């Protein structure tokens, strides 16, 4: 339970600015329209009336990376598309988050060849991995709620750039999905 200060009048709520901004950000962020394969169909149905993304404040998918703060990489990423994905990520304003949607985006899926990137974590830092082929809109809703939890506790101003740089370095230095194959044997 919260402690109440006797000096504060009734009806006054005391909180931090980071808590307010975190709450506002998590209830209104803008996903980037970026469908690369069949997972994009499930991502599109996430915005439809059955899943109803508008309940959580993400009713509009943005076509411009400069207006988006959530990238959903849905589907396989070819070697030719990889620089475009990175360029779109770099054009997004800070803070920004990434969901890797589906088996192809997370690990290359069934396409284990030279033409497909074996996981978009080789290109951009990923915050949430969403398994499945293709994952359902309900699974995407769960991933969005995990992102919302991260957004709620994101630092405000000050050391935000250092936190973002550390997050990207940690993600890009981590063991890739290609190196992790065979760990379940």
Swiss-Prot record:
UniProt cross-references to SUPFAM superfamilies, sorted A to Z: HydA/Nqo6-like
Organism domain of life: Bacteria
Major location (coarse): membrane
Listed InterPro entries: NADH_UbQ_OxRdtase-like_20kDa, NADH_UQ_OxRdtase_20Kd_su
Localization per record: Cell membrane
Binding note for cofactor: Binds 1 [4Fe-4S] cluster.
Cellular component per GO, a single term: plasma membrane
GO biological process: aerobic respiration; electron transport coupled proton transport
Record-level Gene Ontology MF annotations: 4 iron, 4 sulfur cluster binding; iron ion binding; NADH dehydrogenase (ubiquinone) activity; NADH:ubiquinone reductase (non-electrogenic) activity; quinone binding
Cofactors, names only: [4Fe-4S] cluster
Purpose of the protein: NDH-1 shuttles electrons from NADH, via FMN and iron-sulfur (Fe-S) centers, to quinones in the respiratory chain. The immediate electron acceptor for the enzyme in this species is believed to be a menaquinone. Couples the redox reaction to proton translocation (for every two electrons transferred, four hydrogen ions are translocated across the cytoplasmic membrane), and thus conserves the redox energy in a proton gradient.
Family to which this protein belongs: Belongs to the complex I 20 kDa subunit family.
PANTHER family (alphabetical): NADH DEHYDROGENASE, NADH DEHYDROGENASE [UBIQUINONE] IRON-SULFUR PROTEIN 7, MITOCHONDRIAL
Name recorded for this polypeptide: NADH-quinone oxidoreductase subunit B
């Amino acid at each position: 339970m919260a402690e109440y200060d006797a000096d504060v009048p009734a009806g006054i709520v005391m909180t931090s600015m980071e808590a307010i901004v975190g709450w506002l950000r998590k209830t209104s962020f803008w996903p980037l329209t970026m469908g690369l394969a069949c997972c994009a169909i499930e991502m599109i149905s996430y915005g439809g009336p059955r899943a109803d993304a508008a309940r959580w404040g993400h009713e509009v998918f943005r076509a411009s990376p400069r207006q988006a703060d959530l990238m959903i990489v849905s589907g396989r990423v070819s070697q030719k598309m990889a620089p475009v994905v990175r360029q779109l990520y770099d054009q997004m304003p800070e803070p920004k988050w990434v969901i890797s949607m589906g088996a192809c985006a997370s690990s290359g899926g069934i396409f284990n060849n030279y033409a497909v990137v074996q996981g978009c974590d080789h290109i951009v830092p990923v915050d949430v991995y969403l398994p499945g082929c293709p994952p359902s809109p309900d699974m995407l809703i769960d991933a969005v709620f995990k992102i919302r939890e991260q957004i709620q506790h994101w630092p405000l101003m000050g050391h935000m750039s250092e936190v973002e740089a550390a997050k990207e370095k940690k993600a890009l230095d981590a063991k890739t999905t290609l190196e992790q194959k065979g760990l379940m044997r």
